[in-house]
């Protein structure tokens, strides 16, 4: 009888793990389904505009969209380099343009 109990307990463990994974996948899918399709393009265009003035990496900008019952929020975070690096980059750009 203990041998049968061994197989039964692993089955419920496997079912529990599968259920947990499925819940994660469903939550992930719901998050991306409610996200507007224009966000990647918006992020790229914002990067182009910002790069006109300051040299930043692709990872320096993040766009986050949240949707509640009555409102939608678009959060934009940009990590700008320190002002000394910005000045040097701008001066180099001016020197290289002549």
Swiss-Prot record:
Keywords: Cell cycle, Cell division
Family annotation (InterPro entries): MinE (IPR005527), MinE_sf (IPR036707)
GO biological process: cell division; regulation of division septum assembly
Family: Belongs to the MinE family.
Function: Prevents the cell division inhibition by proteins MinC and MinD at internal division sites while permitting inhibition at polar sites. This ensures cell division at the proper site by restricting the formation of a division septum at the midpoint of the long axis of the cell.
NCBIfam families xref list: minE, PRK00296.1
This protein's name: Cell division topological specificity factor
Gene giving rise to this polypeptide: minE
